[in-house]
Amino acid sequence: MLKRKMIRKTPVAMIGVGKLGQSCAEVMAETYPIVGYDVSPRDPRNFNMVKSVEQAVQFADIIFIAAPTPHDPAYDGRYPTAHLPNKDFDYTIVKDILTEVNKYSDRSKLVVLISTVLPGTVRRELEPLLTNARFAYNPYLIAMGTVGWDFANPEMVIIGTDDGSETGDARELINFYRPMMNNDPRYVVGTWDE
């Protein structure tokens, strides 16, 4: 049975309104006031776009980042890669966004990265860029063909924080997600390194 949705007060921003970000933001917009920002023009069905990262950060208490983390074409999944050297994703876009978000943030802001990164990357390369705001890693387990449905009906929600505690930022995210979910998913909280 679907829950009746109602707009809550927590303002939200989605930075990166591509295939993943737009569909997730449209689901969030059924429950929360939300704005989106993307370098490419978008036309979402139920939320407004802003013209800058600064406007997105100023609007929101929770800022989601859904930026691409491209990988080497040899690792696209078409062929086995066990014989190839290990290669990481390219985090340039995410790093640029975090640096800009940091300029306009303070400790009242929770920045949530949903982009794909390898274990250890958040602590080693990304979180140090965000000195003014709080940070959580929250990768989505979503199939690209059914993003909106998968987002509202997850099997589990994964949240990574500095210490892996289920209090503080993790609790804030759990409370944020509950009114949007059409099911009762399992919430798995760990550190950024897990």
Where are these regions (language model features)?
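NAD(P)+-binding Rossmann beta1-loop-alpha1 motif at the extreme N-terminus of oxidoreductases
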Residues: 1-58
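Internal alpha-helical scaffold of NAD(P)-dependent oxidoreductase catalytic cores
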Residues: 5, 104, 124-138, 142-143, ...
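Nucleotide donor/acceptor-binding cores
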Residues: 9-10, 109, 155
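Alpha-helix C-terminal capping/helix-to-coil transition sites in glycosyltransferase folds
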Residues: 58-59, 153
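N-terminal Rossmann-like NAD(P) cofactor-binding module of classical short-chain dehydrogenase/reductase
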Residues: 63-64
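Conserved NAD(P)H cofactor-binding loop of Rossmann-fold oxidoreductase domains
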Residues: 67-68
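Rossmann-like NAD(P)(H) cofactor-binding subdomain of soluble oxidoreductases
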Residues: 71-147
